[in-house]
């Protein structure tokens, strides 16, 4: 009985400690997070597309637009942990052969790492990527802001973001796909790793709209 109680207390403590350092931006409050801004476009909380709940962040962007996210919740702890990084779901309306570029910057505005994400699809795609392990960020770096840079040659587009999180522990199931690359190469440890990962996604992911 005491052993079971200790396990329960430990699990609760872990959950609380994780919530202190990490927050999932699910956009269910119905308003754009404070300080988020785009220089060429419009940010809107929308119920048109969503991965969880009933809302997501709709971004109507124009050529060369930049969305700036200052001091995102959880980013400091994510930087300090070798497994820290970013999780997100992206919905793209019109496929293009250009990238959405996540640029991570320190207090001076210098880029410390980046993640190109190819927009050649329509629908939802996920991102699970580590700052140090996948984006080659130095362990001494500290991220203060995030820039999401939109295509340079495509005139305009609409993209949605949901369940954005800067976390101290990116899932071990992360792997490269058509949209972005990670440095993981040990998939052979699990037979049919891709089938296993996709099964986990189906089990753990909420039912999306579209």
Residue ranges and their predicted role:
Residues 21-38, 173-199:
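Extracellular carbohydrate-recognition regions
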Residues 148-155:
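Short beta-strand-plus-loop segments that form exposed binding edges in beta-rich domains
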Residues 61-137, 157:
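Extracellular ligand-binding interfaces
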Residues 1-8:
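Bacterial N-terminal signal peptides that target proteins for export
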Residues 146, 162-166:
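Extracellular beta-strand elements of beta-rich domains used
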